[in-house]
Amino acid sequence: MKLSSILLALAALVSPAFSYAISHLPRSEGGLDIKLTAIGNTRIKAIITNKADRPLKLLRYNNFFDDAPTQKVEIFKDGNAVQFEGIYQHIYMTDLPDEDFISLTPGESIEREVDIATTADLTQGGAFTISSQGLIPFAEVDSNEVTGAMAFHANDLEMDVDGAVAATVEKAIKPVDKRSRLTNSCTGQRRTATVRAIQASAQLSQRSAQVAQNNAQKLQEYFKQTDQRTRQLVVNRFTAVARESTVNGGRTTYDCTDRMGHCQPRTIAYTLPAQNHITNCPIFYQMPLLTNRCHGQDQATTVLHEITHNPAIVQPHCVDHGYGYQAVRRLNAQQSLQNADTYSLFANGKMTFRLFLY
């Protein structure tokens, strides 16, 4: 069965009369303290402390609590960012189990260690600056539903790295096969699902570019500004994603199975930005192609989200400053422009209707 068209109820997106009603989000600044210290040539320790006057229940993905090779810090050399060589992962946020959260009582601290050379090339050696800031989604103590996001901004850490020693650290990610747009892992139903999701991402991105061009209220909701520069940056990125959403060209390669072994139980897909490579995880194939639920997750917006992470599409590429609608609403304007989930949530915001013709 071929997907011949996807129609998005588009008047609702273009008309400000149907704009999304913003609910008040919990105030969560200053409740989380993260202190970075050097404990080796390229190893650092993060001490995460609950400074709030109440218990915190923090989502463990895409931060220091996550054992996957996700971006936990930013690294700078002579003022320039060092390329991140790990993964950005897209997490399934529905029916989260208890084990997906880390609980901290008031005043409690947890320590985590990471070798930053596993996901960055530090062989040049010398002085590096390490920083970390962002938002961690949280749930209330008696619930597993994410209701807000906790902001954090760690101290800047200066490190003097021995490049020769850094070169001996094993990398978390190995080079991938670039000979094919869809690798030989893409066969049968998984190939069909992936191709359809890529096609749907193209149409969704094209329409989102039109909405960004014409709906100032929606642009303000997600990107915090409506000036011409902001509008053009958003339109350009959606247009680039639409252009890249193809199986006949482009620079992104796809794995339809997890050959590298980085899918966690809740991971929908993940991207290797340094290699412009996307891997679908088992949950991806259990999701609908497109959902009618506002800010719901589906295959098409997952592809859209992952493509924004690839630097071959638009530079600088998107990162994961905030995850989920609550976190996205807390980002400032500059963070919003560089946040992958802002684009996928914009694309399937309230009043989006999809009709399939086969």
From Swiss-Prot:
Name this protein carries in UniProt: Neutral protease 2 homolog MEP8
Active site, UniProt feature: E306
Entry's cofactor comment: Binds 1 zinc ion per subunit.
Named cofactor requirement(s): Zn(2+)
Known role: Secreted metalloproteinase that allows assimilation of proteinaceous substrates. Shows high activities on basic nuclear substrates such as histone and protamine. May be involved in virulence.
A Gene Ontology biological process term: proteolysis
Signal peptide: 1-19
The keyword Secreted belongs to this UniProt entry's keyword annotation: yes
Principal EC category: hydrolase
Molecular-function annotations in GO: metal ion binding; metalloendopeptidase activity
Catalysed transformations (reactions): Preferential cleavage of bonds with hydrophobic residues in P1'. Also 3-Asn-|-Gln-4 and 8-Gly-|-Ser-9 bonds in insulin B chain
Organism encoding this protein: Coccidioides posadasii (strain C735) (Valley fever fungus)
Keyword hit for Isomerase: no
Family, per entry: Belongs to the peptidase M35 family.
Propeptide: 20-179
Gene Ontology CC: extracellular region
Binding locations of Zn(2+): H305, H309, D320
